[in-house]
Curated annotation (Swiss-Prot):
Keywords: Glycogen biosynthesis, Glycosyltransferase, Transferase
Protein encoded by which gene: glgA
Protein's UniProt name: Glycogen synthase
Single GO MF descriptor: alpha-1,4-glucan glucosyltransferase (UDP-glucose donor) activity
Enzyme class: transferase
Originating organism: Pasteurella multocida (strain Pm70)
Keyword Secreted listed: no
GO terms, biological process: glycogen biosynthetic process
Length: 480
């Protein structure tokens, strides 16, 4: 079975969000279970630098100009690079310039990604033809539209990592990307009078996946559907919409061999966790108190992530003698809000604006509780890291957070099911009460260690996800 993943990021070469982490792990896990998986993505500077040895597969001109398709390998995984310097030779973020303006030619840059993915199912590489083209997020959404326009020579799967980003462009660009005007209608590419690359992926694919079962349900509702809930409800009723959880890359995220932390540990030997807590407190110049309940948050600073809820309820942590460290960047008013907290309570709250991979690992290894109070969260990865590292997740019951964390109620603790703290409503009081519950459990260390042990025993490996996708591909291929 030959599967081509079409995407715009690949960890660790280029990352702006969780999509890169998925692409840096899922294809490798699929190879381990016998799938011939490859990736196609634009040859951004960081990608070319990370895969310097390539051969030319094809050279051609199309609607996007002169294109060279190259093939190389990254850690043994086959990767096609779409080499078009006039489109992709731009340093930094792959989607926008340094002033956060989307590139004006994004419609063409990402149409080309979808077009090449479809062509790789029909002979663009004479040595390898994809049986399944698996596109990820709006950037690759047109792949299934091009396949549809070619008579569906391969099966197509589209994964929604975040429905909020829809890739919408003016109608007049349709003639510039090689698709017929007849595809621009409500049963097709059209959304609110524009071309939607995300809707193309939803409408024309043979199957659509969301990155957790709960998120797959949520996006069929007006609250989470972003105007597409009608289409998604139809797909769900047709059996075309499924939720498959993301996994954790054990090679990168495991407390017993994490390359970024000095003190390793595992379930039966937890001394290293205490030492990481000391190191984290020292890094942020907080009192090195082993008895202080240490909360950590590694996130984009946005309302989606519930950062405003934390700002409004952080005094509960202060009042109960806890500590809070935050790493992230985002909305200026939220950055200002958490910096104000740190100035107000310098011995209990510390903040670093920006992103630091090594520090993120230390925070997840050294913290006692990881905060993920998101308003919505398609899957979420940090709570999975928290489980693996024995840093109990405190989450809102949404998306993948609801699928992966079990609330520490008395009954769940007795049944050895509890793995963290869960609150329902996206408001200050609900989060504050969850913080109170965390402090209450912290006072009962024997029970805390029980919950922590159950958390660390959870298995959210990529092998499970890869097996789920394999079953989906097999089902589609059996429909020939």
């Amino acid at each position: 079975m030959k599967v081509l993943h079409a995407c715009s990021e690949l960890y660790p070469l280029l990352k702006t969000g969780g999509l890169a982490d998925v692409m840096g792990a899922l294809p490798f896990a699929q190879k381990e279970i016998g799938i011939d998986a490859r990736i196609v993505l634009p040859a951004y500077p960081a990608i070319k630098a990370g895969i310097p040895e390539t051969t030319v597969v094809s050279e051609f001109d199309n609607f996007a100009g002169h294109i060279v398709l190259r093939y190389g390998e990254y850690k043994g995984l086959g990767v096609y690079l779409i080499d078009a310097p006039h489109l992709y030779q731009r340093e930094g973020n792959p989607y926008h310039d340094q002033w956060y303006n989307d590139y004006a030619d994004n419609y063409k840059r990402f149409a080309l990604l979808g077009w090449v993915a479809a062509e790789l199912a029909t002979g663009l590489d004479s040595w390898w033809h994809a049986d399944v083209v698996h596109a990820h997020d709006w950037h690759a959404g047109l792949a299934s539209a091009y396949l549809f326009n070619k008579g569906r020579p391969a099966k197509s799967v589209f994964t929604i990592h975040n429905l909020a980003y829809q890739g919408q462009f003016a109608y007049h660009h349709l003639v510039e990307i090689g698709l017929p005007a007849g595809m621009f209608h409500v049963d097709g590419l059209e959304l609110h009078g524009q071309i939607s690359y995300l809707k193309a992926g939803l409408y024309y694919s043979d199957a659509v996946t969301a990155v957790s079962p709960t998120y797959a349900k949520e996006i069929t509702t007006p609250e989470f559907g972003y105007g597409l809930q009608g289409l998604l409800t139809t797909l769900n009723s047709q059996g075309k919409l499924v939720g498959i959880l993301n996994g954790v890359d054990d090679q990168i995220w495991h407390p017993n061999h994490d390359a970024y932390i000095e003190h390793h540990y595992k379930l039966k030997a937890m001394t290293g966790k205490r030492k990481n807590k000391e190191a984290l407190q020292a890094y942020f110049n907080l009192p090195q108190d082993p008895d202080a309940l240490l909360f950590v948050m590694v996130t984009r600073l946005t309302e989606q992530k519930g950062v405003d809820l934390l700002i409004d309820s952080a005094e509960e942590i202060v009042k109960q003698g806890g500590q809070l460290t935050i790493l992230g960047s985002g909305s200026p008013h939220l950055e200002a809000g958490i910096l104000h907290l740190a100035q107000q309570y310098p011995h209990q709250i510390a903040v670093k604006i920006g992103y630091d991979e090594a520090l993120s690992h230390l925070m997840i290894a050294g913290g006692d509780v990881i905060l993920v109070p998101s308003r919505f969260e398609p899957c979420g990865l940090t709570q999975l890291y928290g489980l693996k590292y024995g840093t109990l997740p405190l989450v809102r019951a949404t998306g993948g957070l609801a699928d992966t964390v079990v609330n520490a109620t008395v009954e769940n603790i007795k049944s050895r099911l509890a793995t963290g703290f869960v609150f329902e409503q996206a408001n200050r009081e609900a989060l504050r009460q969850a913080l109170v519950n965390a402090f209450a459990l912290w006072q009962k260390q024997r029970l805390w260690f029980t919950v922590r042990s159950v958390a660390m025993e959870q298995d959210f490996s990529w092998q499970i996800s890869a097996t789920g996708y394999h079953a989906l591909y097999q089902r589609l291929l059996s429909f020939n």
